[in-house]
């Protein structure tokens, strides 16, 4: 049994939960962080001195933190080809795109765009203020668009760990009140992800409670 600490509205928790769901693993999740608190509790800091989520513990093993490290742990322990091959060359190809997604998509969307919109009252939102950040993100989404023109998934013909790392933010990207240039390949890719039960369960989570002024 895998124990997960973290609220379901955290994108970093969602990416881990989606991976757990795709791998069909038994789990138990405890809400903490944001309105649930608990991150400064001594027992939590003993597991993760950073006071951040997610944290997991697999059985009686050592607590693990940092979502990308958790994903690699889950893939290495429970994943099979083509999701996470044993052979180094295809596995490295997948890992390359997973790391690219973490650095270039997550960091350029979550804080400069998602949180800017969520934490600004609707009546005061300014699309022009987001244009620089949208431009940066757009350059990387254009790379993804070209990649997805070659194959149905980010690293090739099969769904892999790279899609977990890349695709978990697309629900927010496609549902946030922002202007989005049409990218046909990216939209079709997102629709393929939406067809996956684990994506719908763990990623397509409403985020209204994160908005400024939410109860």
Region spans (language model):
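Short Asp/Glu-rich motifs
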Residues: 38-40, 192, 212-213
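GST-like domain detector, emphasizing the conserved glutathione-binding G-site
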Residues: 1-9, 14-131
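Terminal-tail/helix-coil boundary detector
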Residues: 199, 203-215
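Short beta-strand(s) of the beta-wing in winged-helix/HTH DNA-binding folds
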Residues: 54-57, 154, 200
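GST-like fold's C-terminal all-alpha helical module
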Residues: 98-195
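Conserved beta-strand edge residues that scaffold enzyme active sites
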Residues: 34-35, 162, 207
């Amino acid at each position: 049994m895998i124990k997960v600490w973290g609220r379901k509205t955290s994108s970093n928790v969602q990416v881990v939960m989606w991976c757990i769901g795709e791998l069909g693993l038994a789990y138990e999740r405890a809400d903490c962080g944001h309105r649930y608190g608990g991150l400064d509790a001594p027992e939590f800091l003993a597991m993760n001195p950073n006071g951040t989520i997610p944290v997991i513990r697999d059985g009686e093993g050592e607590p693990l933190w940092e979502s990308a490290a958790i994903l690699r742990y889950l893939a290495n322990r429970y994943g099979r080809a083509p999701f996470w091959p044993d052979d180094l060359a295809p596995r490295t190809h997948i890992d390359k795109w997973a790391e690219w997604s973490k650095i270039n998509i997550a960091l350029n969307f979550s804080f400069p765009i998602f949180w800017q919109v969520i934490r600004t009252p609707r009546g005061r939102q300014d699309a022009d203020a987001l244009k620089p950040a949208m431009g940066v993100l757009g350059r990387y989404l254009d790379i993804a668009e070209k990649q997805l023109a070659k194959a149905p998934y980010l690293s090739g013909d099969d769904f892999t760990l790279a899609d977990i790392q890349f695709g978990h933010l697309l629900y927010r990207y496609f549902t946030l009140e922002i202007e989005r240039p049409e990218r046909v390949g990216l939209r079709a890719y997102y629709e393929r992800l939406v067809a996956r039960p684990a994506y719908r369960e763990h990623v397509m989570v409403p985020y209204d409670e994160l908005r400024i002024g939410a109860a």
